[in-house]
Amino acid sequence: MKNMNKILGLALMVFSAFSCTAQLNPVSWSFSATKVADKTYEVKMVATMQTNWHLYSQKQPEDAIAIPTAFTFSPNPLFKLDDNIKEIGKMEVMKDPTLGVSANQYSKTVTFVQRIKLKANVKTSFNGNVEYQTCDDKKCLPPKTVNFSVAIK
């Protein structure tokens, strides 16, 4: 009976650890597309962070150790990418004098916008993924990848 209690106690600790880790998801993403001109769309990728959490910009200073947010788009012969991804939000420059590093980051929300131009008036989808790292003032979580698909109508 003592062995059974030890096993149950150990199992409870293991599952509790997984449960706590699974709850740490401080960034939520939404994806949408808006027609802005004939055959031209803006795909918006919006990150919303929980209080005290930060998401890093695509562009980081040379002394940064933060992992920048990066997007990968699936090739699609029906459209071409038009310009680079724009970031819309209040960028903060974080400086840590103890470590001698800095980072470009966002709190609360940031919108990434990629313009695309269709080669013809067709329905298609814009697929890809975003890899990002998020931190609060005490810890950073490992990089995470989120896949997405946005209908282009």
Predicted regions and their residues:
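Bacterial Sec-dependent N-terminal signal peptides
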Residues: 1-25
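Extracellular/lumen-exposed scaffold segments
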Residues: 21-153
